[in-house]
Curated annotation (Swiss-Prot):
It comes from Arabidopsis thaliana (Mouse-ear cress). This is Dof zinc finger protein DOF5.1. Residues 139-176 are annotated as: Disordered. It holds the Pfam family Zn_ribbon_Dof. A zinc finger (Dof-type) spans 95-149. Its main location: nucleus. The keyword Protease does not apply. PROSITE patterns: ZF_DOF_1, ZF_DOF_2. GO terms for cellular component: nucleus. It comes from the Eukaryota. Induction: By cytokinin in procambium. The keyword Cell inner membrane does not apply. The lineage of its organism: Eukaryota, Viridiplantae, Streptophyta, Embryophyta, Tracheophyta. InterPro entries: Dof, Znf_Dof.
Length: 399
C-alpha cells in the first residue's frame, strides 16, 4: 500500500481558512491508483470524546461497582447486570418493610430469574419479601438460626449425655435380670474362655450347681449303688429317660462303659478303672480257662457281668431277662461246639493257635448264665477243659 503524504500545518488560526480547499489523496492498491476528492462544505467543530465511567474492581467478591447500583456492587452476568443492560431501573434500596415498617432493608435479587419480581430483605425482622408475591411468615436468616442451633446443641448435648446414661443403666439392669433368671433356671451363660469352661465343669462335677444331682441319676440308670464313687466328666443322663431300646421285657438305655481293645476310652472314666477287663490280645493261649477269670471278676464285682466286646462290662440286672430267655440256646451252642472240637486232631501248630484264639474270642463274648442254665454251664466248662487237654497233648506229640 502506498499512501501520499499529508501536508502538515502549524497550529494557527490561518490553517482553518485553508480547509475550504480540496484535499486530494491517492491510495494505491497493488499498482492501481484511486483518486478520491473530499469536498467538505462547512468546517466541523472538534467533538469531545465521551469516556465511559470508570469501573472499579472489587477485591472481595469479584463484582464491579457501577454508579447508581444497589450497594454499588453488580456481579457480571447477574440479574442486576441484565437489568442494567435492559435499561430497567433497579428497585429502591431503602424500602419500608411490610411487617415492621423498618427502612433498614436491602435489595437481594430477582426471584425466579424474573426482572419483575425483585426480592428484598429486612434486617430488622430478618424476613424476605418479594414485590408482587406472598409474604413469608417464617423468619429466614443466618443469625437467628445460628443462635437457636447453638442453644439447642448445648441443651441437646446434655440430653444426649443423660440419655446415654439412662441407656447404660437399662443395659446393666437387663444384664442383672438375665443373670438372676439364668441362676433361677439353673442355666449358665456361654463361657467366654477356657478358664470359665473349666470352672463350670469343676463346679458341675462337684455338685455346686443346685438342682442337678446328676451322679445319683447316672448311678440309678446304670444300676449302680450309692456306695460307688461318682462318675467324673460324664454328662447327666437324666435327660435321656425317653430314649430306650426295647428288647422284649427289657426297657433300658444301652450305655457301653469301658474301652475297646486298647482300653483308651476307659481311662476317661476314673471311677471305672477297677472294673476294667483285660483286652483280647493280652490273654494267654495255653493252659488257662477264660471262665475262671470271668468268675473272679464277678466275685469281686457281683453287680456286673461280661458284655459283648472286649473289655466291656455292664450291669447284669438290666439284661437279666434277656439272658434267661436265651440260656437254652447258648448252652446248646456251647455243647455242640465242644463236641465237634474234641474229635478234631490238629497237625499244624499255626492252625492250632489260630483255632484256639478264635475259640477264646467266641467264648469270651458269652454272658453269665443263672438259674436253670447252671448245669449246662458246668458241662460246657468240663468240655472246655477236655478240649484244652487234647490241644496240649496233640501239640506236644507233634513237636
Amino acid at each position: 500500500m502506498v499512501f501520499s503524504s499529508f501536508p502538515t500545518y502549524p497550529d494557527h488560526s490561518s490553517n482553518w481558512q485553508q480547509q475550504h480547499q480540496p484535499i486530494t489523496t491517492t491510495v494505491g492498491f497493488t499498482g492501481n491508483n484511486i483518486n478520491q476528492q473530499f469536498l467538505p462544505h462547512h468546517p466541523l467543530p472538534p467533538q469531545q470524546q465521551q469516556t465511559p465511567p470508570q469501573l472499579h474492581h472489587n477485591n472481595g467478591n469479584g463484582g464491579v461497582a457501577v454508579p447508581g447500583g444497589p450497594g454499588g456492587l453488580i456481579r457480571p452476568g447477574s440479574m442486576a447486570e441484565r437489568a442494567r443492560l435492559a435499561n430497567i431501573p433497579l428497585p429502591e434500596t431503602a424500602l419500608k418493610c411490610p411487617r415492621c415498617d423498618s427502612t433498614n432493608t436491602k435489595f437481594c435479587y430477582f426471584n425466579n430469574y424474573s426482572l419483575t419480581q425483585p426480592r428484598h430483605f429486612c434486617k430488622a425482622c430478618r424476613r424476605y419479601w418479594t414485590r408482587g408475591g406472598a409474604l413469608r411468615s417464617v423468619p429466614v436468616g443466618g443469625g437467628c438460626r445460628r443462635n437457636k442451633r447453638t442453644k439447642n446443641s448445648s441443651g441437646g448435648g446434655g440430653g444426649s449425655t443423660s440419655s446415654g446414661n439412662s441407656k447404660s443403666q437399662d443395659s446393666a439392669t437387663s444384664n442383672d435380670q438375665y443373670h438372676h433368671r439364668a441362676m433361677a433356671n439353673n442355666q449358665m451363660g456361654p463361657p467366654s474362655s477356657s478358664s470359665s469352661l473349666s470352672s463350670l465343669l469343676s463346679s458341675y462335677n462337684a455338685g455346686l450347681i443346685p438342682g442337678h444331682d446328676h451322679n445319683s441319676n447316672n448311678n440309678n440308670i446304670l444300676g449302680l449303688g450309692s456306695s460307688l464313687p461318682p462318675l467324673k466328666l460324664m454328662p447327666p443322663l437324666d435327660f435321656t429317660d425317653n430314649f430306650t431300646l426295647q428288647y422284649g421285657a427289657v426297657s433300658a438305655p444301652s450305655y457301653h462303659i469301658g474301652g475297646g481293645s486298647s482300653g483308651g476310652a476307659a481311662a476317661l472314666l476314673n471311677g471305672f478303672d477297677q472294673w476294667r477287663f483285660p483286652a483280647t490280645n493280652q490273654l494267654p493261649l495255653g493252659g488257662l480257662d477264660p471262665f475262671d477269670q470271668q468268675h473272679q471278676m464277678e466275685q469281686q464285682n457281683p453287680g456286673y457281668g461280661l458284655v459283648t466286646g472286649s473289655g466291656q462290662y455292664r450291669p447284669k440286672n438290666i439284661f437279666h431277662n434277656l439272658i434267661s430267655s436265651s440260656s437254652s440256646a447258648s448252652s446248646a451252642m456251647v455243647t455242640a461246639t465242644a463236641s465237634q472240637l474234641a474229635s478234631v486232631k490238629m497237625e499244624d501248630s499255626n492252625n492250632q493257635l489260630n483255632l484256639s484264639r478264635q475259640l477264646f474270642g467266641d467264648e469270651q463274648q458269652l454272658w453269665n448264665i443263672h438259674g436253670a442254665a447252671a448245669a449246662s454251664t458246668a458241662a460246657a466248662t468240663s468240655s472246655w477243659s477236655e478240649v484244652s487237654n487234647n490241644f496240649s497233648s496233640s501239640s506236644t506229640s507233634n513237636i
